[in-house]
Each structure stands twice: as C-alpha cells, then as structure tokens.
Regions:
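Extended, positively charged loop/linker patches that create polyanion-binding surfaces
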Residues: 97-102
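Anion (oxyanion) recognition and catalysis
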Residues: 105
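Conserved N-terminal beta1-alpha1 strand-loop-helix module at the mouth
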Residues: 1-77, 81-82, 88, 94-96
Length: 111
C-alpha cells in the first residue's frame, strides 16, 4: 500500500502561497490537499477555482480537492477543468450522490 504526505493548503500563509508550494515540491511532496468550503455546507469560506487554477500553473503536485460545499455535483466538472486530480465529496452534501460519483468517474480522476 502506498502512503502520501498530503499537506493542506488551508494551513498556508496566503501572502506566500506560491513560495510555500514551491518549497513543498522542492522537499519532495507529491500531493496537496485542497479544502474548498462554501460558507453554506460548512460555516467557513476558503477559496475556489481561481486559486486552484492559479496554483495548477505553477505546480505538478497531485491536487486532492475536498469539496466541502452544498450540492458539489454542480461544481465537479469545473474543479476537474481547473486542475483537480482527485475529488472528495460529502454524501450528505449531495443533492444526487450517484450523479456526483458518476461525474467524478467520467472525468477519469480519482474519487
């Protein structure tokens, strides 16, 4: 079984985000965990597609995107398009869990 150190971008200093991601890559980190929060499904708001798209241009790490949002199936393709390599959703957040899983599988990324 493979194990991966997967630091969370949520703990980054956003004033130095690019530099910190570069440091992680230089240290051999292969995966980056990205918590996307919408302020509805969870009380906090983090960031979304523009941030992921921006860091994807600068990073070859595996992006493990955790959608902590209401009705995540509405956004799956958008997150795939901006660079997610893996998407995790909460079953209770989905309006249609089967559809969410189908969309992730059809995108050929990891669930």
């Amino acid at each position: 079984m493979d194990y991966h150190l997967c630091p969370s971008i949520l703990s980054a200093d956003f004033n130095r985000l690019g530099q910190q991601i570069q440091t992680l890559e230089e240290e051999g980190v292969k995966w980056l965990h990205i918590d996307v929060m919408d302020g509805d499904f969870v009380p906090s708001i983090s960031f979304g597609m523009p941030v992921i798209r921006s860091i994807r241009k600068e990073s070859k790490m595996f992006f493990d995107v955790h959608l902590m949002v209401s009705a995540p199936e509405r956004y799956i393709q958008d997150f795939v398009d901006c660079g997610a390599d893996s998407i995790t959703v909460h079953a209770e957040a989905c309006e249609d869990l089967e559809r969410a899983i189908e969309l992730i599988r059809l995108s050929l990324i990891h669930i």
